[in-house]
Amino acid sequence: MLILASASQSRKKLLENCQIEFIQISSNFDETTIQEKNIFNLALELSFQKANSLSENIQNISLPEEFNYGPLEILGCDSIFEFKGEAYGKPSNKEEAFIRWKKMSGEFGFLHTGHTLIIGHFDSTSKIFKITEIIKKTVSSRVYFSKLEDWEIKSYVDTNEPLYCAGGFALEGIGGKYIEKIEGCFSNVMGLSLPWLRENLYRS
């Protein structure tokens, strides 16, 4: 059974749409505790900490009976958008979102998603989760943006969608029409590389 260690609705929808059985439990890991300047490595470290935090607290979580003695996979993900060497998380306000989109208009950036899969077995009687394998990888996709007029950017920012997304855009939402093309994994831009997950769930 798979546990998604994230509160992300886009990751939840990706898993539901491709019919992967899972339950969703937020890890509540404090991301501000990690200091890593390399964006690629930061995404990977945050994904690991989210999954690991949940694995360490699994005994305090009420899990369905089918988890007992069975294989358990905990998936942690973290997405960071890189534009010209700078990390773009969620914009803090509309003004910041507008300024970013002015820069990104007609340009490209990279969406890095760190993936960590902690695989093991959980014994609900002893409350012990025994880890057998940890698989980690950062998957990167190149995202090309359309050349936009100021009124288009303002119109998009006014929807508030950019304020809730890494990089200030949602491929699966309103922002999809402002993205010209993607090089690399498509679902990775929405926060989870489904081909990577399929390959590694199959291995486990």
Curated annotation (Swiss-Prot):
Catalysed conversion reaction: a ribonucleoside 5'-triphosphate + H2O = a ribonucleoside 5'-phosphate + diphosphate + H(+); a 2'-deoxyribonucleoside 5'-triphosphate + H2O = a 2'-deoxyribonucleoside 5'-phosphate + diphosphate + H(+)
Main location: cytoplasm
Cofactor: a divalent metal cation
Pfam families associated with the record: Maf
GO CC, one annotated term: cytoplasm
A single GO molecular function term of this UniProt record: nucleoside triphosphate diphosphatase activity
Chain segments annotated as coiled-coil in the UniProt record: none
UniProt-annotated catalytic positions: 78 (proton acceptor)
Enzyme type, top EC level: hydrolase
Cytoplasm among keywords: yes
Gene Ontology biological process terms in this record: nucleotide metabolic process
Keywords: Cytoplasm, Hydrolase, Nucleotide metabolism
UniProt keyword Hydrolase, yes or no: yes
NCBIfam families: maf
Protein name: Nucleoside triphosphate pyrophosphatase
Organism: Prochlorococcus marinus (strain MIT 9215)
